[in-house]
Amino acid sequence: MQNDRKKHTRNFSIVAHIDHGKSTLADRLLEATGTLTQREMENQVLDKMELEKERGITIKSQAARLVYKRDDGEEYILNLIDTPGHVDFNYEVSRSLAACEGAILVVDATQGIQAQTLANCYLALDHDLEIVPVINKIDLPSARPDEVKEEIEDVIGIEAHDAPLVSAKTGLNIKDVLEAIVEKVPVPDGDEEAPLKALIFDSYYDSYKGVVCYVRIKDGVVKPGTKIKFMATNKEYEVTETGIFTPNFFPMKELRAGDVGYITASIKNLRDAGVGDTITEASRPAKEPLEGYRPAIPMVYSGIYPVDGAKYEELKEALEKLKLNDAALSYEPETSIALGFGFRCGFLGLLHMEIIQERIEREFNLDIITTAPSVIYNIYKRDGEMLKITNPTNMPDPTEIEKMEEPVVKASIITPSDFVGAVMELCQNKRGTFIDMEYIETTRVVVNYYIPLNEIIYDFFDMLKSKTKGYASLDYELNGYKQAKLVKLDMLLNGDVVDALSMIVPEERAYNKGRAIAEKLKEVIPRQMFEIPIQAAVGAKIIARETVKAMRKDVLAKCYGGDISRKRKLLEKQKEGKKRMRQIGSVEVPQEAFMSILKVD
């Protein structure tokens, strides 16, 4: 009976470029198999977060179990694992794929193959998954299914002549997709007699059950009461509940090899159940864990401060709660002279950073100031010490530094061939090194570049979109460190360094960047009763200056005619007063000032 059950099980995930209709297709599959009633049906069922629905993106992996009855009466259990499509969440995608045997590759019939289609598809091929191409949005007048089929065959090299042509929006031909899954996705392998091995492909914190681990059982059996051990952290727990997803939790008495489900074991800390870790039995552990586990490493750092200093504790609580559900978020307290107490937070990428900031503001109702994002630099000092720096204010004195290294990414950009020149110019301006380019078809090109990560984290994506009228798509992965000539650029207001505005920039750009930021600050800092010099400095050398003029009262209004010396006396008196004010006056830096710097090119 058990083997029979395994024969009728299929584990698959859906991969696609952003906006090619992945979550909508998942909705239709849930609907077609009757997993959810009409009443429970809503758009993007698997995207549970408000933000996910609003932005139309998938952030966390989710899972659902579909029961599909074929026309011959046979019942199949299809486990769908929904994956995020954005490049920041690449690791989550790779863990979700490791839990499957097959992947549906959704391609938009109007747009064809895009950068993330390729990136996610190669990820799936790395995991030896069977790929089932599905062409979506064929109800649109601009759909060109035959060309897209050829493109899939030429570029990715998988057969697509019999790919289902569907419209996830209208529900057209959804049954073909279910048939293709049953036909093409392999039966899960795994030995129920062997020691337990379960891959965690996602985990989240539930305030009643503790940490809930989403798992794919590779070998063995797990049931409530089993003593389990996490192989990366060596922590041991007793299982309290096992079950499956009908998107909502449904307890079962056990999970066997080949199943996808969840395990709870009164775990208090998400860190103990890292995504990608292997669960095994404490009394009969597996010899080695499943491969591919790596702790989530933040790539981008930024300071987050409460606008109202008294709300520091609330911000700390908010970050603690978000951390429960997001193992990739890291934070530590820091203080800034300009902004008071706050936290230095690490993120997977820019989208991840935006989402966390937005969730703090929305879910916890806090006003926050965020500083310019920065990456991790390696600094080698003359005394042989090596420092990793995420905050420009911690950079040692330039005289102590032997050399500095910055992280570099390998970026693949797919663009219509008309815009190749503009894309290459953008990459060169961002200190990119050309690798190669190849034509996918006569009208589209893949361009590969090595680009320093700190050039990408500001506005690279926006500029790429505007230079290509929104047609280009980008995918990048970290590619190690390389030596660079970098300096710390400080901004001074009224002679004081504003630490939150400091940044690390390439030496040859320091002057232009300093000048541009000074001009920008001049626009956003409100005028005071005394004049404020805004200076950009590298070390002790001032490289640019702007002045915010003082507001002044017309002290000569009451002199009609009269002697010049009388007027001079009044003006001198005013000047003295302004000078005194300037010595004791402090400058408030508005939130816009921090944000405007990000947009300076």
UniProtKB/Swiss-Prot annotation:
Catalysed reaction equations from the record: GTP + H2O = GDP + phosphate + H(+)
PANTHER family registered for this protein in UniProt: TRANSLATION FACTOR GUF1 HOMOLOG, CHLOROPLASTIC, TRANSLATION FACTOR GUF1-RELATED
Cross-referenced CDD domains: EF4_II, EF4_III, LepA, lepA_C
MF (Gene Ontology): GTP binding; GTPase activity; ribosome binding; translation elongation factor activity
Compartment(s) where it occurs, according to its Swiss-Prot or TrEMBL record: Cell membrane
Pfam families in the cross-refs: EFG_C, GTP_EFTU, GTP_EFTU_D2, LepA_C
Name of this chain's protein: Elongation factor 4
Domain tr-type G: 7-189
Main EC class the enzyme belongs to: hydrolase
Enzyme Commission number(s): 3.6.5.n1
Membrane topology per record: Peripheral membrane protein
Primary location recorded for the protein, binned into one broad class: membrane
GO BP of this protein: positive regulation of translation
InterPro entries, A to Z: EF-4, EFG_III/V, EFG_V-like, EFTu-like_2, G_TR_CS, LepA_C_sf, LepA_CTD, LepA_IV
Amino-acid positions noted as binding GTP in the UniProt annotation, renumbered to this chain: 19-24, 136-139
Organism: Clostridium novyi (strain NT)
